[in-house]
Regions:
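N-terminal secretory signal peptides that target proteins for export/translocation
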Residues: 1-15
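Internal signal-anchor transmembrane helix that establishes type II topology
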Residues: 15-21
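Bacterial N-terminal signal peptides
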Residues: 21-31
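C-terminal region of N-terminal signal peptides and the immediate post-cleavage residues
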Residues: 30-40
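Acidic/polar surface patches and capping/hinge elements
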Residues: 39-446
C-alpha cells in the first residue's frame, strides 16, 4: 500500500484544535434554548439555498468562473446575504458593517434582494436568469410593509459589499516570471499554459489580514530524504500507467479529480436542508464556509506564487538535473489526471477542503443535536472515468475527508504529499481565524 504520510498528522492536528472549541460551542448552544427567530417561525430558510443554487449557476455555468476564482466570487454574494439576514434577525454579528435593519423587515426579502443585486452588478449577462429567480423569490413573500423593508435593507447590504470590495486587486495584470531551473515551476503538458489567475495571490482577502498571513515554510529541499521519499511515492502511485495503485485508490483519486466548487455548494445546501437550519444559521453556514474557503484559496495562491515549486510531472521528467542521486528521471512518465496550470506547493484543493470542512464543523457545533466534531457532509463527484459517476461519498468528520483528499492528490500524480499535508493545515488555520473574528453569536440576541 502507499505510505500514508501525513494522514495521522492531520487527524491529530484536527482533534487538538477541535476538542475545546466544539465542547464550548455545544454547551453554549444547549444553554440558549428557543430564540425569537425560532418562536416566530416566519422566515423561510429556503431562500438561502435557492439563491446559493442561482449563484452557482450564474458564476460557474454562465460566467465560467471555476476553481479558486469561483469561490472567490461566491464570497461577494454570501457575505451580502449573511448581512441582509442577521442585520434583521440580530442573531449574529454583522460582517464588516454596523447598519442593522428593522426587526419587522422580512429577512427572506432582504436575502433575495442582496443576492440578486450583487450578482446582477458583477454578472449583468445573467440578467434573465436573475430576474426570473428574483421574481420567484418575491412572489413567495406576502406583500406589505415587512416585504418593502426587507427589500430596502437587502439593497443596502448589497451596496455595502460592492463598496467594500472596490479596488481589491482582482484581475490585476500579474504574471509569474521565473527562471528555468530545478525545483522551479514551469508550464505543464498538454496545454503548457501560464499560471492560472495569478492575481489571486495578491488580492485583498475577506477575513485574513493579508494573503501571506498563514504562508508556510518552504517545501522540502531537492536533496532531502523527505523529497526523495515523496518523489518516489508520487512517481510510483501517481503514474497513469503501470502504477502500484489499488482499484480503490484509483477511485479515490478520480473522485477528487472533479470536486467542482459548485458541487461543494450542493453539499452545503443538502446539509442545511437535512438539518433544518433556520434562516440565520443557514446564512451563517454559507458565509463562513465560502469566505474561509475563498481566503484559503488566496493563501494557497500566495504561497504558490512565492515558492513557485515544480509539479511532479516536471520533477520526474527532469530528475537528472535535481542534484539528487536517489531520484531517477523518466521522460515518458505521465500523471493519472492532467496537471492544473499552477505551482505544486501548497495544494489548492486540500486547502479548500480543510477550510470548508473546518468551518462547517465549527458552525454546526453550535446547532443543537449535532454530534461534537461531526462534519456529516455528502459530497458528489461527476469526474470523467469515475465508475458509477455521479458518485456520492459521505464524510462523517473533517479528518476523514482530509485523509482522502491528501491521498487523492498524490495518487492522481499531481502533488507531492507535503503540498497536501501543509495545505490542509493552512486551510484549518484560515477557517479558525475567520470564525474567531467573524460570524460570532450575539449574546442575548434573537
Amino acid at each position: 500500500m502507499s505510505p500514508d504520510l501525513g494522514a495521522g498528522r492531520i487527524g491529530r492536528f484536527w482533534k487538538r484544535r477541535t476538542a475545546a472549541a466544539v465542547i464550548a460551542a455545544a454547551l453554549l448552544a444547549a444553554s440558549i434554548g428557543g430564540t425569537v427567530e425560532a418562536r416566530r417561525g416566519a422566515a423561510d430558510p429556503s431562500v438561502i439555498t435557492d439563491w446559493n443554487a442561482t449563484m452557482v449557476a450564474t458564476i460557474v455555468v454562465d460566467a465560467g468562473k471555476a476553481n479558486a476564482e469561483g469561490i472567490f466570487w461566491y464570497s461577494f454574494v454570501q457575505s451580502a446575504v449573511y448581512n441582509a439576514v442577521v442585520g434583521i434577525t440580530h442573531r449574529y454579528e454583522l460582517y464588516k458593517w454596523d447598519v442593522r435593519g428593522p426587526r419587522s423587515a422580512s429577512p427572506e426579502a432582504a436575502a433575495a434582494t442582496a443576492a440578486y443585486r450583487v450578482l446582477l452588478y458583477y454578472f449583468p449577462a445573467s440578467q434573465v436568469r436573475l430576474d426570473a429567480a428574483y421574481a420567484a423569490s418575491l412572489a413567495k413573500i406576502p406583500d406589505g410593509r415587512s416585504k418593502r423593508q426587507g427589500i430596502r435593507y437587502g439593497k443596502r447590504a448589497a451596496a455595502h459589499i460592492i463598496r467594500l470590495r472596490a479596488g481589491d486587486g482582482r484581475n490585476a495584470p500579474i504574471t509569474l516570471d521565473v527562471p528555468l531551473a530545478a525545483g522551479v515551476w514551469r508550464p505543464t503538458p498538454p496545454a503548457m499554459a501560464p499560471m492560472l489567475i495569478p492575481w489571486l495571490s495578491q488580492v485583498r482577502p475577506f477575513t485574513l489580514r493579508s494573503p501571506s498571513q498563514f504562508r508556510p515554510g518552504p517545501p522540502p529541499a531537492l536533496t532531502s530524504p523527505t523529497y526523495t521519499t515523496e518523489f518516489n511515492e508520487v512517481k510510483d502511485f501517481g503514474s497513469k500507467t503501470g502504477s502500484s495503485r489499488s482499484d480503490a485508490q484509483t477511485q479515490t483519486a478520480l473522485f477528487f479529480s472533479d470536486i467542482a466548487i459548485g458541487a461543494l455548494q450542493g453539499s452545503l445546501r443538502d446539509l442545511a436542508t437535512r438539518r433544518g437550519l433556520n434562516i440565520s444559521d443557514s446564512a451563517r453556514l454559507f458565509a463562513a464556509a465560502d469566505l474561509a474557503g475563498s481566503d484559503s484559496g488566496i493563501a494557497a495562491w500566495d504561497a504558490k506564487f512565492h515558492y513557485h515549486w515544480w509539479r511532479p510531472i516536471t520533477a520526474i521528467t527532469l530528475a537528472a538535473d535535481d542534484g539528487n542521486p536517489d531520484t531517477a528521471a523518466d521522460g515518458l512518465w505521465a500523471p493519472l489526471i492532467t496537471t492544473p496550470p499552477y505551482p505544486d506547493y501548497p495544494s489548492g484543493l486540500c486547502n479548500l477542503m480543510a477550510a470548508v470542512s473546518r468551518s462547517v464543523t465549527r458552525v454546526m457545533s453550535t446547532i443543537p443535536g449535532t454530534v461534537p466534531g461531526s462534519l456529516d457532509l455528502n459530497i458528489t463527484s461527476v469526474a470523467a472515468g469515475l465508475p458509477g459517476a455521479p458518485l456520492t461519498r459521505h464524510y462523517a468528520t473533517a479528518a476523514d475527508l482530509l485523509t482522502d483528499a491528501i491521498n487523492a492528490r498524490v495518487w492522481s500524480g499531481i502533488h507531492f504529499r507535503t503540498a497536501d499535508v501543509v495545505a490542509a493545515q493552512m486551510g484549518t488555520q484560515v477557517s479558525n481565524w475567520a470564525l474567531d473574528h467573524y460570524f460570532k453569536r450575539i449574546r442575548n440576541g434573537d
